[in-house]
A protein has these predicted regions:
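Charged, compositionally biased N-terminal leader segments and the immediate start
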Residues: 1-46
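Intrinsically disordered or highly flexible coil/loop and linker segments, enriched in small
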Residues: 36-40, 67, 109-116
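Amphipathic alpha-helical interaction modules
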Residues: 38-76
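Amphipathic protein-protein interaction modules
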Residues: 62-101
Length: 122
């Protein structure tokens, strides 16, 4: 199990098939679930840029509309225990980064599952 004190490192930025539009699908999901403006999100193949943009959105939501942030986490089905673990951590400065990593990881898993379902492999 990955410690929440370390940043998730994506060996392949789009582990489920970059050639199949994972970056575009990720941006679309983030836009829908977190009201990110598509035009302001970095290029779809720039995971570091997308992550940085998402970190800023997490900071904004947590400080201005915490209930909406929690609602968004619930809507994308992020594990409540993982959210609690991040919020209880001693290192408060990395909370937005850890949430961004968790959101990206969950969104990529959702995309993979949807694609498997559509192709009849699930």
């Amino acid at each position: 199990m990955k410690s929440y004190n370390e940043k998730i490192v994506f060996k392949n930025p789009f582990p489920f098939g970059e050639g199949f539009g994972m970056g575009q699908s990720l941006v679309e999901k983030l836009h829908k679930d977190f009201s990110l403006e598509k035009e302001s999100v970095p290029a779809v193949n720039d995971l570091a840029g997308i992550r940085e943009h998402l970190i800023n959105k997490v900071i904004e939501l947590m400080s201005k509309d915490y209930e909406r942030f929690l609602s968004s986490m619930y809507r994308i089905d992020v594990s409540e225990s993982k959210v609690s673990k991040i919020l209880r951590s001693k290192d408060r400065t990395t909370i937005p980064e850890r949430f961004a990593d968790l959101i990206i990881e969950r969104q990529l898993l959702r995309i993979k599952t949807q694609r498997l379902y559509r192709s009849g492999k699930l």
